[in-house]
């Protein structure tokens, strides 16, 4: 079933394939257990991203979840590692995620979001902007207060300006449920 067929089909496909995709990412992940950049962080970015996506017209929540899974998967340690986003995008390409029914456009957006997420820039694309905002709204975990001026979307700016903290989800099944 294609992940992009229609809203209901997309949600079902993503829910069914999320664990399979994770099973491909985990063995290649260099930061899996990192307290700052590991799988708990990926899940938090996915959860925040889904909150923001629901309030961002034109945002593709599937891409946001894929970004969350891959953006820090190739990070080496918790010290500065600027090329880790490009390595995450390369990992995504190597996994041949198109076989799960994602469109070329979705995969290109996810790769661009991964590749460029550490540059500190803003994006006019609602999906890429949501990805970056979701990651930046977790900066408090490394002692940095998220700032509205570094958010690409209205939802991200509002969350940063208010100091909002997002509820964490405890497992990927909850992320998959929230795609609906």
Describe these PLM feature segments.
Residues 1-16, 30-58, 70, 98, ...:
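Divalent metal-dependent phosphate-bond-processing catalytic cores, especially two-metal-ion Mg2+/Mn2+ enzymes
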Residues 16-21, 59-66:
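Short coil-to-beta-strand
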Residues 18-22, 46, 85-93, 111:
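An amphipathic alpha-helix signature
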Residues 21-31:
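Generic N-terminal amphipathic, Lys/Arg-enriched alpha-helix
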Residues 32-44, 75-90, 104:
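Active-site metal-coordination segments of metallo-dependent hydrolases
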Residues 61-80, 84, 88, 110-118, ...:
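His-Asp-centered metal-binding catalytic motifs of divalent-metal-dependent phosphohydrolases/nucleases
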Residues 77, 95-100:
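Short, charged helix-to-loop "capping" segments that act as catalytic/coupling loops
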Residues 102-105, 109:
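Internal alpha-helical transmembrane segments of multi-pass membrane proteins
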